[in-house]
Regions:
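Long, amphipathic alpha-helical surface segments
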Residues: 98-189
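Exposed alpha-helical structural elements
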Residues: 11, 15, 33, 97, ...
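Extended amphipathic secondary-structure runs
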Residues: 50, 55-72, 92, 171-189
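Surface-exposed interaction patches
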Residues: 63, 68, 77-111
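Solvent-exposed loop/turn segments at secondary-structure junctions
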Residues: 8-11, 91-96, 130-131
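Acidic, aromatic-lined catalytic clefts of primarily extracellular/periplasmic carbohydrate-active enzymes
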Residues: 1-85
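Residue-identity detector for glutamine
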Residues: 3-4, 17, 50, 92, ...
């Protein structure tokens, strides 16, 4: 936000930066209150700032990195569904982490070429939500039992509590893939 020519974007960036450093560096009450105030003042404008920030900081860099390093890959060859999957994974894992997730998913399929888009979506979410039994903190409880993940951990989220991992598991292995597949069915090529 601070690098933008638009004065509104810069003012949002400055306010958030000031809130972050107010009372010592870190997120907390000052930051949360400023975030809420920005949303209350202009929710549409603030949403636009957030989307542009994610696009410039995460989505465009992951697409550029994939297109530069995966021969023949172009995000423009795919529907909004797969592009949204790349957006989501880049925002979650960061550019470097998302690149690893996506290229591992492609490798698990034997490459991305000639793969149905639905398979690419499923493979990316499967890798992002990959399970491991080699972690100190694991998922447990009735919901974990129901999904067959009790005693397991998410490979990319082992530093999180079992409860957080279970919530992320449901998002990565149930909710987001289903929404992406529905979007593909509705808007796909």
């Amino acid at each position: 936000c601070l690098q933008q020519d638009d004065t509104y974007y810069r003012s949002v960036g400055e306010r958030l930066q000031d809130a972050y450093y107010s009372g010592g560096a870190g997120y907390g009450t000052n930051f949360d209150n400023t975030w809420r105030a920005l949303n209350n003042e202009d929710s549409a404008g603030f949403l636009r700032v957030q989307r542009n920030y994610v696009r410039l900081s995460y989505y465009e860099p992951i697409v550029a990195k994939l297109e530069a390093n995966v021969p023949g890959f172009s995000a423009d060859d795919y529907s909004i569904a797969l592009r949204n999957v790349l957006w989501s994974r880049a925002a979650q894992h960061g550019t470097g982490g998302a690149y690893s997730v996506v290229t591992r998913a492609f490798a698990a399929l034997g490459g991305f070429k000639n793969q149905p888009e639905a398979e690419l979506i499923d493979a990316i979410y499967a890798e992002s939500g990959r399970l491991t039994t080699d972690a100190a903190t694991t998922m447990s409880g009735a919901t974990a039992e129901r999904y067959g993940v009790s005693g397991k951990a998410l490979a990319y989220y082992t530093g999180c509590s079992g409860e957080v991992q279970l919530g992320v598991y449901l998002r990565l292995r149930v909710n987001e893939p289903a929404k992406a597949q529905a979007m593909l069915a509705q808007y796909g090529y």
